[in-house]
Amino acid sequence: AHRDHAQGLSLFHENFPQIPIYSSKVTKEFLKLQDFLPLCHVLPWRSPVEVAPNLTIELFPSGHLPGASSILLTYLTSSRPYKVFYTGDFSLSKFQLVEGLSLEELRGITPDVLILEATYGTARHPHRRQQEKKLIQQIDDILASEGNILFPVPTLGIGQEILKLLRSHHQFTGRDLDIWVDGKLIFACDLYLKLLREFPSSVQNFANHQSLFWDEQICPRMRHFAEKKNFPLKEKPCIILTDQIEDFTPYFQSHPGNWTVLIPENLTLFFNAKYHHFLALTQPQNVPLETYLLAEHSDGQNTTQLIHNLRPQHLIFVHGKTEYLTDLASLEELQNRYQLHIPTIGTTIELPIGERFIRPQNLPQAYYEGEIKEEENEVIINVSREIQKDIRWHNLADTGIIEARWQGNELVLRGLSQRELFRYKNEGQSNVFDLDCSGNCLYHKNQQCYNPDSPLYGLKVPFEGYCPAFE
């Protein structure tokens, strides 16, 4: 029911009204939030339904979001059945409000074709509970410094996950704290409450003992704004979640304290228009913009686990940056077993079933030649500027400072974020981080670097940031 999947439904239905649209019960309700009339035919979970002669469709809960579905299409012929499994957006991890895609339920399906979303490519993430623990600590640190927090979130999904986490985590149970919700997020939360019977039993049990969302009695209190311009906030620090992202000024002006805006980490990985929009809203008011990780899709490890459990003949990667899809399709463990495809617009893909396995041609991977210079007190690694053309370069070079470690006989480089640098400094790990503070630099103005000789030139740099070109 996320907008990137649902935005074309109305136009599709207008042009092809005779074609039925199928969904899960929860998705049909959620589509009301996307201004799409609920014209869907609801299908039950885990029950094949014949939608055309010899063609059945079966839905499986895919994790990611309540109601999100993976789809098994089976076409029966006199010789054999042909199966296509489409994951949709999926996650194997258990979230606060939704179970992960069950590998046990899929055992034995063995589709001929697997169409797989691969949003994160080969990236590996910490366990879901570790992600939540880190976010809770991040929130706690900001509140401890008397700061307020604003979460701009989508209408569905991660916002409700954060609300449930704050309501149930032991660090916040009974805490004198106000959590406010604004925008369409209010109606989305009401829909969650209406559909509680469709949620995991653990969520239903929690809701039987205390309200899942709205509660002004049990701390932390959770409320919503009755009117757009009426923010009855107290002087104590608070948390606001909203899907209204056009202007943050009313929120910042509603409370005299300092503010921090927290956004999902994935928004900074590419030249994301929404990330730059958030920068434009926060920089002029000197409001820090920090990131957190609550992954909504499976990482590379869980993605390959699903592939090996289903054992398809053909594997089609979709729903991700080309670089990430290519990384995943370049894994030797996949190339040796499956026929791999990355489709492009307007190109037909042939999927011969049952024929002899043909090892796919190696997909082009970018390698960058360079040289090593050994100086008296340091080692310099030079590579071609071609490396900057990759969309991942921006994330690596964000602060201009990297961390290097050995992995077998290979040297792995990783860019360090401003938050990591600040943490290293606080923990007394000075070494390469013992640099002058950006806030005292001649070229640091309005939380931005204006030094053309700095690797941070043109980027947002908070006061505690570090730069090797400090002056």
PLM region spans:
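His/Asp/Glu-rich metal-coordinating catalytic cores
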Residues: H2-W180, I186-C189, L196-F199
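Core dinuclear metal-dependent hydrolase active-site scaffold
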Residues: H5-G8, W45-L101, I218, F225-I239, ...
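A conditional alpha-helix N-cap/helix-loop micro-motif detector
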Residues: H2, R128-E132, R221, L241-T242, ...
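Short, basic, glycine/proline-bearing loop/turn elements
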Residues: G121-R124, W214-D215, E235-C238, N286-T291
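Generic long, charged, amphipathic alpha-helical segments
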Residues: Y275-Q305
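Short, compositionally biased "basic patch" segments
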Residues: Q96-T119, E198-N205, P256-P284
